[in-house]
Amino acid sequence: MGKTRRNRVRNRTDPIAKPVKPPTDPELAKLREDKILPVLKDLKSPDAKSRTTAAGAIANIVQDAKCRKLLLREQVVHIVLTETLTDNNIDSRAAGWEILKVLAQEEEADFCVHLYRLDVLTAIEHAAKAVLETLTTSEPPFSKLLKAQQRLVWDITGSLLVLIGLLALARDEIHEAVATKQTILRLLFRLISADIAPQDIYEEAISCLTTLSEDNLKVGQAITDDQETHVYDVLLKLATGTDPRAVMACGVLHNVFTSLQWMDHSPGKDGACDAILIPTLTRALEHVVPGGAKFNGDARYANITLLALVTLASIGTDFQETLVKGNQGSRESPISAADEEWNGFDDADGDAMDVDQKSSSGEDQEEDYEEIDVKEDDEDDDDDSITSEMQADMERVVGADGTDDGDLEDLPTLRELIQTAVPQLIRLSNLPIDSDESLTIQSHALSALNNISWTISCLEFANGENANIHNAWYPTAKKIWRKTILPILEADSADLKLATQVTSLAWAVARVLHGETPTDGNPHRKFISLYHSSKQQAGGNSNSIEEPEDPFQGLGVKCIGVVGSLAHDPAPIEVNREVGVFLVTLLRQSNNVPPAEIVEALNQLFDIYGDEELACDKEVFWKDGFLKHLEEFLPKMRTLTKGIDKRTQPELRTRADEALLNLGRFVQYKKKHAPK
């Protein structure tokens, strides 16, 4: 009978630590022997002074990439967690937290996951409790401590805050775990509410709370329910100020309002919703002046400006939920699907274009539009003030007796976005690009405009639905087109990232304006040219543009979406013809065109030529023989669709299937309704 094998692990000096092989690189091997091993030996020394000195030394050398990698090989994390953080000497503990902070900052997110699995949250909670007690105790009061002692407390606090923020960002499950730690939340509330922390610690605390409060109902409720420091009231008061802390407070409050669903139609305490934050966020943008990156003489405003732009962009996106919830019960299907550019033909709809149904001139489309009796301005004033032109456009849209922005009284957030934020965003999108900072500001301003524009473009405006929003947005959309989109197009930048941003914005704006988009300078030709030039650049340099994970977010798809929207009735027939030929040509060259672009081209053709009553149907679709090309493309589309893997690209396959189905129906419908 065999003997049970003896467990040799118990005979090791340290069962957790495995023998570490020295690196094969001579330089690293020497560095390990001369610097790393001696300092690690001192870190585990019985002598308290040696341990403290070693911890401080490691906190310094861990910044160096080579030293950091060697320290990680030698199990420095295990030593710090089990020995340094429990040291009686506060200097050692401060150095230990500094080591973990730097490692978390320099390494990938997986390192934070590793720390979490080593139960670092327990150590953080214990340290946070100690800091909280030090700050709140009256014997002795914190203010009476020696400056050196206070500095050590703030050093530990700063390291804890950075670690908490990085851990929360690393993975959703860690985010949720941190949000349940009441001691951590109490420390954050105390640092924000009590005017005791240095500016850098305060900013780190509010940044950390912003991270934790994002999409987290528990944290949102904890903030509003806090009776110890009344942090919610403090944040509200801060948000009305004019200093950088006001913008930081707005970031937290926006997350709170979103998680608690305090919206325009269901505001929270004292009418709290995002509308009260927009004026403060917009004021922060006024510090950015032409000539640049100095931000009116204070470089500190750069980060605050970016935070304000990011928060406005988030408000622009989250406002879509407000529109959905506000329309529930009063309208059916007020929002079109944002991820579908055409919903196909509905078999249940009596107006569906199906040969098996009675024909009519209606169809189920996402991009329906109202026939608006309006003439475009031939000239645009260069005055920075937007108010007068917006009012003039408004009168053209709704008539002299029409309603004005007062119709948005029940949508204060949208009103503030249109009247207060968008003018500043337009201004920032046109800043002279003379530094990396100004380029970053422009990019974030475009992102905010893009989010706001797409949220509104996904509304249903057919048959007078959401007319008040359309009337308020229409002149603003034209202003964005003239003041932001056209200048960037005319600059003809080779920056494909910028081109992608402005094309996405143009698509969102054109979806609302349709064929009434200003045609100054033939923008459809510019976007067609941009489409072709992007293909040439991508073909010549694989690194010229990063392919998005979602194939429908590529520059090519966006260019197709823009030109399709520009061709909608009542666009000039020549514009319609040029766009139609471009789209049909893409289908004929389908072997060299990505499937997502083919799908978008088909959807745009369906939308443009779906109504046989429009002039473009006869003058372009039939005169230019588009039906023949669509019939010839049908078998190619079947082959293309079958070649898309459902497992690896499920959305692309689904939308390709829909486009194929609709193409067959569209061809049959057109054949049945050919002009006589």
From Swiss-Prot:
Residues 1-10 have a biased composition (Basic residues). Residues 338-354, 363-385 have a biased composition (Acidic residues). Residues 1-28, 325-385 are annotated as: Disordered. InterPro entries: ARM-like, ARM-type_fold, Nuclear_Import_Ribosome_Adapt. Disulfide bonds: none annotated. GO terms for biological process: protein import into nucleus; ribosomal large subunit biogenesis. The keyword Transmembrane does not apply. It comes from the Eukaryota. One of its GO terms (molecular function) is unfolded protein binding. ARM repeats lie at residues 183-216, 420-453. Keywords: Repeat. Involved in ribosomal large subunit assembly. Belongs to the nuclear import and ribosome assembly adapter family. Component of a hexameric 5S RNP precursor complex, composed of 5S RNA, RRS1, RPF2, RPL5, RPL11 and SYO1; this complex acts as a precursor for ribosome assembly. This is Symportin 1. It comes from Chaetomium thermophilum (strain DSM 1495 / CBS 144.50 / IMI 039719) (Thermochaetoides thermophila).
